[in-house]
Regions:
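Cysteine-centered catalytic environments shared across enzyme families
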Residues: 1-241
Length: 241
C-alpha cells in the first residue's frame, strides 16, 4: 500500500505452510508493489501450462486461484466462440478470459467452489473473490503499509508483523457456535475472512469497493408444481451440484 516493492522472503515464508496442500509446484510473480505466490496441487491441467500465478500478457491479467470451476469446459467453448484462444486445458485460464469478456458479471456464470485474486494491470486494480457458499477460504489483513491475503490463516500469519490481538466477539462466536466464527470476523481482530459471494476491488490509491454478487433466495413458485415436477427439479439440482 506504500508503493514499495515487497521482499521475496515474506512471500516464501507464506508459501511454506501451504506445501502440504500444494505439493506439485510453486510459483512467485511480482510487478511493482504487488506480489503473488502459489502452491499447486495439479488436478486438471497437469502440464506446466497450468502453472500459477498465471499471467496473460495479452490481456494484462494475472491470477492466483484455489478451487474448481465445474462448468469450465462449457465456458471455454463459449469464449472460443467469442474469439478467445487458450494455451492451457484447465479452469484457471477460463477465469481470466471470462473476466475480460464479461467483467465482474463473469462470476455469475461460474458453477463451483473458488477463491481467487486477480490483478488487472491496465486498470491497476486487485480483485479478491470468494464463491457463493464460502467453501474455499480467503483471509486478508491490511495496515498502513501493506495488504496481505492467503487461503489459510497459518500462511497469512507466516508473513510476520500481523496483529494477533483476539477479537472478543469472535471468541464468543467460537465458543457458542461450535468453533464457528462467521465471516468477516476471525479470532484475530485485524485478520478478516472474505465473506461468501463477495467481490472486493482494491485500487492502486488504496480505495476499496466491495459488493455481494449473489444471495440465497427462497420463494414459492408462481405456479404450483406436482410431486413429479418437484422430484425432477430436485434431481436436476443434484445433477448440477
Amino acid at each position: 500500500m506504500d508503493g514499495m516493492a515487497p521482499d521475496s522472503v515474506t512471500i516464501r515464508k507464506m508459501l511454506q505452510p501451504l506445501r502440504p496442500r500444494g505439493p506439485d509446484d510453486e510459483g512467485v510473480w511480482q510487478q511493482g508493489p504487488l506480489q503473488f505466490g502459489h502452491r499447486r496441487l495439479s488436478i486438471l491441467d497437469l502440464s506446466e501450462r497450468g502453472h500459477q500465478p498465471m499471467v496473460d500478457s495479452e490481456l494484462a491479467f494475472t491470477i492466483v486461484f484455489n478451487g474448481t470451476i465445474y462448468n469450465f469446459r462449457e465456458l471455454r467453448e463459449e469464449l472460443k466462440g467469442l474469439g478467445y484462444h487458450f494455451t492451457s486445458t484447465g479452469d484457471t485460464e477460463v477465469i481470466l478470459k471470462s473476466f475480460h469478456a464479461w467483467g465482474q458479471a463473469c462470476v455469475e456464470r461460474f458453477a463451483g467452489m473458488f477463491a481467487f485474486a486477480l490483478w488487472d494491470q491496465r486498470a491497476k486494480q486487485l480483485h479478491l473473490v470468494r464463491d457463493r457458499m464460502g467453501i474455499k477460504p480467503l483471509y486478508w489483513t491490511q495496515d498502513g503499509k501493506r495488504l496481505l491475503f492467503a487461503s489459510t490463516l497459518p500462511a497469512l500469519l507466516a508473513a510476520g508483523g500481523v496483529d494477533t490481538q483476539f477479537d472478543p466477539l469472535a471468541l464468543h462466536h467460537h465458543f457458542s457456535l461450535h468453533a464457528v466464527v462467521p465471516a468477516p470476523r476471525t479470532l484475530f481482530r485485524e485478520v478478516h475472512k472474505m465473506e461468501p459471494a463477495h467481490w472486493k476491488t482494491i485500487h492502486a490509491d488504496g480505495l476499496t469497493e466491495q459488493h455481494r454478487y449473489w444471495s440465497l433466495t427462497a420463494q414459492r413458485p408462481v405456479e404450483a408444481k406436482s410431486e413429479w415436477e418437484w422430484a425432477e427439479a430436485g434431481r436436476e439440482s443434484l445433477m448440477q451440484a
